[in-house]
Amino acid sequence: GARIVNIASTEGLGATRFISPYTAAKTGVIGLTRSLAVELGPEGITVNCICPGPINTGMTQRIAPEQKAEFARRRTALRRYAEPEEVAHMTLSLCLPSAGYTTGVALPVDGGLTIRNA
């Protein structure tokens, strides 16, 4: 069957002060993922969503390295930012035949950020 993998953010799974438009948008992606999973499931199409946490990308490039290290140390179980390839590999894994019974999932790829915030 076909696969759809949307990209949201851990912000769609929780909330942070002063970025409500971003949080609302990412929560919307998660809702869309779940609705499409129900709608497209009968056609054999799985729809899932990756929710990345802190990643070394252009979006985080402007943050000072010591600030990033402190954030990761305090907030993630793995105490580091992810590399883009780690998120890409998890995204690809949802497209493999072995993920054929997985649908409607919002999967955190966040080094344990969401469990540390719980």
PLM regions: where:
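Short C-terminal tail/terminal secondary-structure segment
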Residues: 14, 92, 103-118
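Active-site helix of classical SDR
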Residues: 25, 33
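Short, flexible catalytic-loop segment of classical short-chain dehydrogenase/reductase
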Residues: 13, 51-62
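Residue(s) in the substrate-gating loop at a strand-loop-helix junction
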Residues: 9
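A conserved structural motif in NAD(P)-dependent oxidoreductases
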Residues: 76-87
